[in-house]
Amino acid sequence: MLHVENLCKTYPTPQGPLPVLQGIDLSLKSGSSLALMGESGSGKSTLLHLIAGLDQADSGSIRSGEHRLELMNEGQLANWRRSEIGLVFQQYNLIGSLRVEDNLAFQARLAGRHDPRWQKHLVQRLGLSDLLKRYPEQLSGGQQQRVALGRALASKPKLLLADEPTGSLDEATSDEVLRLLLELLDDTPTTLLMVTHSQRVAARLAERVVLSSGRLT
């Protein structure tokens, strides 16, 4: 379960503090999915970074399962990210010195859940079979996005945070990725929180909320 309570975040600017998130409350049960929508600059990506423990809120609390993020130190947060969550952000952060096949397995191996059969299934579903021996610099943006998604899914995370995971994909590949995400939700207790601008993508998930001016509506 993911539970966010009264979360607030501001950033300093020359004109003074800029409120980005104002009193966000959000709850997701294990195995559920939520599409987070809203205009650019509304705080969607900031919310995902806070939930991932990559930034600190000014106030409020975030609880994932038994973990309260505001009570964890950097080492504990890093271990939690490795073992329990999958991240697909707009910066794909693939490891340049590793081939695609090793990038795919990297997160799962760190989490101690590397499953060659599941990885093979992901490779087939994401259309990566011909790319396994390539390095990230040899891939297009859309190909890198598919690898990043495969890496996040390979460990069957308890919580998957995805920021525009289909943004660089054509419609056919986007539909295949969504089918794969829904399949993962059916087969595992993974909880999905996805940022998307696409009404078509959001409509495939169980629930939708809109973030506007730092508040959920």
What role is predicted for each listed range?
Residues 2, 7-211:
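ABC family nucleotide-binding domain
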